[in-house]
């Protein structure tokens, strides 16, 4: 996990004490949180569908922010997580597949303990969408600005061989 700490106005990572993170870069997490929070308004869409009770924001490679919300139905196969909906919004609206940063939550920001982690299906989807997503930062604790990468969550992902084969062909 990556922890950030501040010295004066500069931010540093715990992994590499010499790496400076620009102060305006720190604002991206607040912007993402606020954009996702706009989507949070749990509602019963119909007697069969419940939505907007989990929300997500992702930052695409070009810096644009895309959001998503969870949709659950009484038929589980039609459920879609906020995470995948945000990624699909990114792809549908820009054609991008690489995700730089990710935050997901219910009624409050992630506070450690796995409260904002993508589920296994979403982790798999992110890997399949773009191999480079293994380096996406996933918010673990919003107040501490603690993150983890997809690669750290799934260090032995099965699809790396297929990506390697595709590159060699």
Regions found by a protein language model. Give the residues of each.
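Short, positively charged and aromatic/hydrophobic N-terminal segments
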Residues: 9-13, 17
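Hydrophobic "anchor" residues
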Residues: 64-65
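C-terminal binding/interaction regions
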Residues: 25-45, 98-169
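Short beta-strand scaffold segments in enzyme catalytic cores
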Residues: 51-60
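Compact, glycine-rich, soluble single-domain proteins
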Residues: 70-84
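Active-site- and interface-proximal helix/loop "cap" or "latch" segments in soluble metabolic
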Residues: 79-83, 89-98
């Amino acid at each position: 996990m990556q922890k950030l700490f501040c010295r004066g106005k500069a931010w540093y990572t715990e992994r590499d004490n010499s790496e400076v993170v620009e102060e305006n870069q720190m604002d991206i997490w607040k912007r993402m949180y606020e954009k996702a929070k706009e989507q949070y308004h749990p509602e019963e869409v119909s007697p069969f569908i419940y939505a907007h009770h989990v929300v997500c924001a992702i930052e695409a490679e070009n810096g644009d922010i895309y959001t998503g919300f969870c949709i659950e139905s009484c038929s589980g196969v039609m459920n879609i997580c906020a995470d995948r909906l945000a990624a699909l919004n990114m792809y549908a609206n820009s054609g991008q597949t690489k995700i730089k940063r990710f935050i997901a939550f219910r009624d409050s920001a992630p506070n450690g303990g796995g409260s904002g982690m993508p589920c296994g299906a979403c982790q798999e989807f992110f890997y399949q969408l773009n191999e480079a997503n293994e380096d996406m930062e996933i918010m673990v604790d919003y107040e501490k600005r603690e993150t983890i990468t997809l690669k750290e969550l799934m260090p032995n992902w099965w699809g790396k061989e297929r990506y390697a084969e595709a590159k060699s062909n």
